[in-house]
């Protein structure tokens, strides 16, 4: 494990100021292809490859940016256009936790209004606790502001599609279109006059762009074609998702997460009577969960949240001593453990599973190319930050590109792309490392490690300024 973490740390560091790295970035990105630009090719200022949540939001943000009013933007999406004529009464099992920072981005180009007019559920508190002890941490806001929102991915996608249609004169969307080849010129200088990226689509057509943005997922074709190294490994876990019905209606404004020895289980509010499940566990157990009958599955969920079977007297006694000491030092505002709502049933056909892993690109940018979202990083869902990291990438990249456009600079120049990389690698690397450490620390019931994490969680819960810093970091 130490070797792996050391390897990860070495590859995650930002090395763009090294002259050797700059020379490498200026080299050919696809060695087997020669620069074959044609004056007949359609030319775009920006091409976004990948029309998922992050790619579509990127195109939206650029299309609505005042300094891009005279730019041509293209969004490539391999799938068909998704129409949402009427909101289904059944909730989707794929949801995202949207942070305040992400709502600011979505509001900046009008998508958040569409989301609020459809459906989303705010949560004002988050309780995280250990199944092997009484340790917990409660995140909340004294001013009663919302900590975040749980939104179905389909709803977010609908809102983004509506806002893309609003800027159709600036942003062209090609559905059922996928790039199958990229050509960069050979070694060239960092000057603004460097040649553009040449893209071949599946139908044989070609185009050119001043900046290619890869938003095509953790198996990114843009990243691979650019020859950007990616540190990645698969976790020994899959995530089980489902839509759950509560036993009784509640205010349901708390997000719950409990760390089990096999992985974390989370309950995210959807409405007063519904919640979304994300249960990370071993591949074998995940397969069992999705194949169980409904009653057995519901019992397994309630037991996972309520049972104290993993407790030991020794750890409970040590935990109680620390808890009493904290109460003496800080007799007020110590969060008390609450219990999550019980589950009554599960929506039919809402159960699904997907494998988990970690990934991080050693570089986010090369001349005329930038990576965002899962193309640049992949994270465990225990942090609830996957799409928020991607939206954070967008906020940073749009800021740098907007400044470049305002100043009449070349959009594909490294002079501002490296600013984006520095901003986001600093944030994302810290979050990835912390999440990976938590995943490993809580994937054991060994007494010494249980004690260590118990005391750490209790201490963190008692220090309000530290919790505020954690919430502020996660809200970006």
Swiss-Prot record:
- The chain residues annotated with the modification N6-succinyllysine are 219
Q: Name one GO cellular component term.
A: mitochondrial inner membrane
- Catalyses which reaction(s): 4-hydroxy-3-(all-trans-decaprenyl)benzoate + 2 reduced [2Fe-2S]-[ferredoxin] + O2 + 2 H(+) = 3,4-dihydroxy-5-(all-trans-decaprenyl)benzoate + 2 oxidized [2Fe-2S]-[ferredoxin] + H2O; 2-methoxy-6-(all-trans-decaprenyl)phenol + 2 reduced [2Fe-2S]-[ferredoxin] + O2 + 2 H(+) = 2-methoxy-6-(all-trans-decaprenyl)benzene-1,4-diol + 2 oxidized [2Fe-2S]-[ferredoxin] + H2O
Top-level taxon: Eukaryota
Compartment list: Mitochondrion inner membrane; Golgi apparatus; Cell projection
| Predominant location | mitochondrion
Interval spanned by the transit peptide: 1-35
Names of the cofactor(s): FAD
Provide the alphabetized UniProt keywords. Cell projection, FAD, Flavoprotein, Golgi apparatus, Membrane, Mitochondrion, Mitochondrion inner membrane, Monooxygenase, Oxidoreductase, Transit peptide, Ubiquinone biosynthesis
Task: Tell me which Gene Ontology terms the entry assigns under biological process.
Answer: ubiquinone biosynthetic process
> Which pathway, per its entry?
Cofactor biosynthesis; ubiquinone biosynthesis
Database matches in InterPro entries = FAD-bd, FAD/NAD-bd_sf, Ubi_Hdrlase_CS, UbiH/COQ6, UbiH/COQ6_monooxygenase, UbQ_mOase_COQ6
Q: In which tissues is it expressed?
A: Expressed in the kidney, in podocytes.
* A molecular-function term among this protein's GO annotations: FAD binding
Q: Which EC number applies?
A: 1.14.15.45, 1.14.15.46
Quaternary structure note: Component of a multi-subunit COQ enzyme complex, composed of at least COQ3, COQ4, COQ5, COQ6, COQ7 and COQ9. Interacts with COQ8B and COQ7.
Q: Give the family this protein belongs to, as stated in its UniProt record.
A: Belongs to the UbiH/COQ6 family.
HAMAP family noted in UniProt: COQ6_monooxygenase (MF_03193)
Q: What does it do?
A: FAD-dependent monooxygenase required for two non-consecutive steps during ubiquinone biosynthesis. Required for the C5-ring hydroxylation during ubiquinone biosynthesis by catalyzing the hydroxylation of 4-hydroxy-3-(all-trans-decaprenyl)benzoic acid to 3,4-dihydroxy-5-(all-trans-decaprenyl)benzoic acid. Also acts downstream of COQ4, for the C1-hydroxylation during ubiquinone biosynthesis by catalyzing the hydroxylation of 2-methoxy-6-(all-trans-decaprenyl)phenol to 2-methoxy-6-(all-trans-decaprenyl)benzene-1,4-diol.
- What is the name of the protein in this document? Ubiquinone biosynthesis monooxygenase COQ6, mitochondrial
Its ancestry begins with: Eukaryota, Metazoa, Chordata, Craniata, Vertebrata
């Amino acid at each position: 494990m130490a070797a792996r973490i050391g390897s990860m740390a070495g590859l995650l560091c930002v090395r763009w100021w090294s002259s050797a790295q700059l020379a490498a970035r200026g080299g050919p990105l696809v060695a087997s292809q020669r620069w074959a630009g044609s004056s007949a090719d359609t030319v775009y200022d920006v091409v976004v490859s990948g029309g998922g949540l992050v790619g579509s939001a990127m195109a939206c943000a650029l299309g609505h940016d005042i300094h891009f009013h005279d730019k041509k933007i293209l969004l490539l999406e391999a799938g068909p256009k998704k129409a949402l004529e009427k909101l289904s009464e059944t909730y989707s099992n794929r949801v995202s936790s949207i942070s305040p920072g992400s709502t600011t981005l979505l509001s900046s180009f009008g998508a958040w209004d569409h989301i609020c007019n459809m459906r989303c559920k705010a949560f004002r508190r988050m309780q995280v606790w250990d199944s092997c002890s009484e340790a917990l941490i409660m995140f909340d806001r004294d001013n009663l502001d919302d900590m975040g929102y749980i939104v179905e991915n389909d709803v977010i996608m609908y809102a983004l599609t509506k806002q893309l249609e609003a800027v159709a004169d600036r942003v062209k969307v090609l559905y059922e279109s996928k790039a199958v080849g990229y050509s960069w010129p050979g070694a060239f200088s960092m000057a603004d006059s460097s040649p553009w990226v040449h893209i071949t689509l599946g139908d044989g057509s070609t185009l050119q762009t001043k900046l290619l943005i890869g938003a095509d997922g953790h198996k990114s074709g843009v990243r691979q074609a650019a020859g950007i190294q990616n540190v990645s490994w698969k976790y020994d876990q899959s995530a089980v998702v489902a839509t759950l019905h509560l036993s009784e209606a509640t205010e349901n404004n708390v997000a719950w997460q409990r760390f089990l020895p096999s992985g974390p289980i989370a309950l995210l509010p959807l409405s007063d009577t519904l919640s979304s499940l994300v249960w990370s566990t071993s591949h074998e157990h995940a397969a069992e969960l999705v194949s169980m009958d409904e009653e057995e599955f519901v019992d397994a969920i309630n037991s996972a949240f309520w049972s104290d079977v993993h407790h030991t007297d020794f750890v409970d006694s040590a935990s109680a001593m620390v808890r009493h000491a904290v109460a003496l030092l800080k007799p007020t505002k110590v969060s008390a453990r609450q219990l999550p709502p019980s589950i009554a049933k599960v929506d039919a056909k809402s159960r699904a599973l997907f494998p988990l892993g970690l990934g991080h690109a050693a570089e986010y940018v090369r001349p005329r190319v930038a990576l965002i979202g899962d193309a640049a990083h992949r994270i465990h869902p225990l942090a609830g930050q996957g799409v928020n990291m991607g939206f954070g990438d967008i906020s940073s990249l749009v800021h740098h590109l907007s400044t470049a456009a305002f100043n009449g600079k070349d959009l594909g120049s490294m002079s501002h792309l490296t600013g984006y990389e520095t901003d986001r690698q600093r944030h994302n690397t810290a979050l990835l490392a912390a999440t990976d450490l938590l995943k490993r620390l809580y994937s054991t019931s060994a007494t010494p490690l249980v004690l260590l994490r118990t005391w750490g969680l209790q201490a963190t819960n008692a220090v309000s300024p530290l919790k505020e810093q954690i919430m502020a970091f996660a809200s970006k």
